[in-house]
Amino acid sequence: MNTLFDKIWDAHVVTTVEDGPTQLYIDRLYCHEVTSPQAFAGLRERGIKVLRPEKVFCMPDHNTPTHDQDKPIEDPISKTQVDTLTKNAKDFGLTHFGMMHPKNGIIHVVGPERALTLPGMTIVCGDSHTSTHGAMGAIAFGIGTSEVEMVLASQCILQSRPKTMRITVDGELGKGVTAKDVALYMMSKMTTSGATGYFVEYAGSAIRNLTMEGRLTLCNLSIEMGARGGMVAPDEVTFEYIKGRENAPQGEAWDQAMEYWKTLKSDDDAVFDQEVRFDAADIEPMITYGTNPGMGMGITQNIPTTEGMGEAAQVSFKKSMEYMGFQPGESLLGKKIDYVFLGACTNGRIEDFRAFASLVKGRRKADNVIAWLVPGSWMVDAQIRKEGIDKILTEAGFAIRQPGCSACLAMNDDKIPAGKYSVSTSNRNFEGRQGPGARTLLASPLVAAAAAVTGVITDPRELM
């Protein structure tokens, strides 16, 4: 009667405090430059070493520029954070993939692609989108800086056991509908608090038919529904993705791992605290129109009106519409845009670049659009060039930048100017997220590509 979550959680329990939290063993800690400095400072103050340095992997991503990475970072705060991570990793004997290192990239892209993330693991990082790794059949969630220090010192963390939710999506996804659209659709129905307090398992035929990278996108956005994390049971798709990668088990170790991994699925009689179901046929290419990821709609639909909303909801909705410069009830099709961003830990993988390139091939970037195409890692960048995707993009008028979090958040040079519209494949569209006054519309790589070549919001199915 155990869920996938139960099986992994229970296998990692060290002890449970009566009427209190669980001491949970952690298999993998990822550290980036923004949330780790105080944790390492705390260890120094108390004279504590990192208990299991081989379990910790560090890399800068939030502050890294996406051009001229071989030169010093100009912003003093960003430079200090990146340099501090380098020093901390060296001082404490930790694996560190610095800027320009061939294994560097966004931490939630590098972990899975290097098979540092594996099924059955418990994984934490001082970053909310750590839930991405759950796509591999792991328990993965973001933690605070004090908890990062706790894991560095003890390889354990104190956590209250969350409730479980299963979201089942059955059926076949339609033309032009991607994992990003599935996630945005879920949020539009469940809101940004619909999964608060839960750890979500995604299931159903539509989920099983997603590629590994599609599942990573889906789990990445779990936190935007309020969930503690999201996960997908490992299957042949997972195993084929992992096999032969750099840190994957080899030989007899692979056989032993596979034997265990195949047990990582919810039992047929498993009981979840909540069950939610969706039909894949109801999902079309999505786009957001407001200032939280739950404010999304099918690209052919109109922005909702305030009819039926409570007073508080109306105030919030009107504030969002004012910020975005939209009117209730209007369509976004044909709306002129200024920027397109392909990248982030949500959609910065090779499949995302393949999708984008497939739609822009033989076309040209619209003159009114500034496009930032940012690989999620140097491995993705190398694969782009190996497959000739860079040539397709260059011929269409696009340029590929260097890996990093880039325009997902305004912590580096890639900021959207105030008042400008950005069709972005990232994960958050909060006010000012991409820069003070920036207006963000979240979408899939296909929707972003359609906007990039037409200069306006366009249904990608019209170009496919």
Curated annotation (Swiss-Prot):
PROSITE patterns for the chain: ACONITASE_2
Statement: the UniProt record of this protein carries the keyword Lyase: yes
Domain of life from the UniProt record: Bacteria
Keyword vocabulary terms for this entry: 4Fe-4S, Amino-acid biosynthesis, Branched-chain amino acid biosynthesis, Iron, Iron-sulfur, Leucine biosynthesis, Lyase, Metal-binding
An MF annotation (GO) of this entry: 3-isopropylmalate dehydratase activity
Record has Ribonucleoprotein as a keyword: no
Pathway entry: Amino-acid biosynthesis; L-leucine biosynthesis; L-leucine from 3-methyl-2-oxobutanoate: step 2/4
NCBIfam families: leuC (TIGR00170), PRK05478.1 (NF004016), PRK12466.1 (NF009116)
Catalytic activity: (2R,3S)-3-isopropylmalate = (2S)-2-isopropylmalate
Self-association state and partner proteins as the record states: Heterodimer of LeuC and LeuD.
Residues annotated for [4Fe-4S] cluster binding in this entry: C345, C405, C408
UniProt name for this protein: 3-isopropylmalate dehydratase large subunit
EC number assigned by the record: 4.2.1.33
Covalent S-S links between cysteines: none
Role of this protein: Catalyzes the isomerization between 2-isopropylmalate and 3-isopropylmalate, via the formation of 2-isopropylmaleate.
Family statement drawn from the similarity comment of this UniProt entry: Belongs to the aconitase/IPM isomerase family. LeuC type 1 subfamily.
PANTHER family found in the cross-reference section: 3-ISOPROPYLMALATE DEHYDRATASE, HOMOACONITASE, MITOCHONDRIAL-RELATED
Cofactor: record remark: Binds 1 [4Fe-4S] cluster per subunit.
Lineage: Bacteria, Pseudomonadati, Bacteroidota, Bacteroidia, Bacteroidales
One Pfam family linked to the record: Aconitase
Cofactor (UniProt): [4Fe-4S] cluster
Organism: Bacteroides thetaiotaomicron (strain ATCC 29148 / DSM 2079 / JCM 5827 / CCUG 10774 / NCTC 10582 / VPI-5482 / E50)
GO BP field: L-leucine biosynthetic process
